[in-house]
């Protein structure tokens, strides 16, 4: 990882979901690649006041643990996320097995608490083939995400397993 261009670390998620759904008054298209972001050095630096280079080193030291697939459990929250450039996505928030314990170890090694990321999977986009929208801190969730109402959330969650 180059500290001048810190890399986000992710693990892939395999889900059998439809290529197109209708929810929240729009048609949405499946993302070609599904993942959970586990570690974003630049956003963690801003949220924790830790040095980005120290976070990059910690990410490298724990890369295998941060990028290996883990069990996830969708928690029932689904949100529409909007970027300033007009892109829109649908995300399902999830719990990630063992990520809290890993973050405790990372925090101990860095000598400061690291906030857990708001773990989620970006499932669909408003434009076919569009990328995701950064959602790696609670502040970004508050600024960019709007929870779907129960009926629309159920329409999305109906395609997801409780545990992946």
What are these regions (language model features)?
Residues 1-164:
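Histidine-dependent nucleotide/RNA phosphoesterase domain, centered on the 2H-phosphoesterase fold
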């Amino acid at each position: 990882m180059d500290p001048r261009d810190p890399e986000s670390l992710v693990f892939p998620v395999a889900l059998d979901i439809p290529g197109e759904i209708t929810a929240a008054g729009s048609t949405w298209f499946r993302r070609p690649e599904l993942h959970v972001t586990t570690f974003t050095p630049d956003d963690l630096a801003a949220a924790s006041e830790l040095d980005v280079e120290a976070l990059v080193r910690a990410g490298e030291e724990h890369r295998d643990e941060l990028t290996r697939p883990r069990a996830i459990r969708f928690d029932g929250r689904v949100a529409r996320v909007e970027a300033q450039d007009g892109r829109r996505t649908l995300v399902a928030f999830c719990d990630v097995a063992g990520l809290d314990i890993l973050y405790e170890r990372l925090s101990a090694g860095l000598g400061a608490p690291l906030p857990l990321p708001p773990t989620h999977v970006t499932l669909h986009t408003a434009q076919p083939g569009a990328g995701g929208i950064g959602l790696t801190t609670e502040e970004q969730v508050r600024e960019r995400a709007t929870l779907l109402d129960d009926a629309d959330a159920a329409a999305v969650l109906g395609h997801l397993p409780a545990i992946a």
